[in-house]
UniProtKB/Swiss-Prot annotation:
Pfam families with a match to the protein in the record: ApoC-I
Keyword field contains Cell membrane: no
Keywords from the named record: Lipid transport, Secreted, Signal, Transport, VLDL
Biological function: Inhibitor of lipoprotein binding to the low density lipoprotein (LDL) receptor, LDL receptor-related protein, and very low density lipoprotein (VLDL) receptor. Associates with high density lipoproteins (HDL) and the triacylglycerol-rich lipoproteins in the plasma and makes up about 10% of the protein of the VLDL and 2% of that of HDL. Appears to interfere directly with fatty acid uptake and is also the major plasma inhibitor of cholesteryl ester transfer protein (CETP).
Organism: Ellobius talpinus (Northern mole vole)
Family statement drawn from the similarity comment of this UniProt entry: Belongs to the apolipoprotein C1 family.
Location(s) in or outside the cell: Secreted
BP term (GO), one: lipid transport
InterPro entries in the cross-refs: ApoC-1_sf (IPR043081), ApoC-I (IPR006781)
Keyword Zinc set for record: no
Signal peptide (from-to): 1-26
Gene name of the record: APOC1
Record's protein name: Apolipoprotein C-I
Gene3D superfamilies listed in its UniProt record: Apolipoprotein C-I
C-alpha cells in the first residue's frame, strides 16, 4: 500500500523538478535589468524621501520633543550669555 501511494508522488515530484522554473520565475536577462534600474532607483528615492519627511514631521509635532528642543535652546542661550559676560 505504501509503495502504491509513494510511486505517483515520486513521479509528480520528478516531473516538477525536471520541468524547470516557470516563465514568470525565470531570471530576467541583464539588459532588461539595466533598463529598469533608473526607474527602480527613482521609485526607491521617492519612497525614501516621503518616509524621511513623514518621520521629520512626526518628530517636530511631538510635544515632548518640542519641549526638549526649547529647553536645550534656552539653556544654550543662557550658557552663551554667561560665557559672554564672564570673558568680556
Amino acid at each position: 500500500m505504501r509503495l502504491f501511494i509513494s510511486l505517483p508522488v515520486l513521479i509528480v515530484v520528478l516531473a516538477m523538478a525536471l520541468e524547470g522554473p516557470a516563465p514568470a520565475q525565470a531570471t530576467p536577462d541583464l539588459s532588461s535589468t539595466f533598463e529598469n534600474l533608473p526607474d527602480k532607483l527613482k521609485e526607491f528615492g521617492n519612497t525614501l524621501e516621503d518616509k524621511a519627511r513623514a518621520a521629520i514631521e512626526h518628530i517636530k509635532q511631538k510635544e515632548f520633543l518640542t519641549k526638549t528642543r526649547t529647553w536645550i535652546s534656552e539653556t544654550f542661550g543662557k550658557m552663551k550669555e554667561k560665557i559672554k559676560t564672564t570673558f568680556t
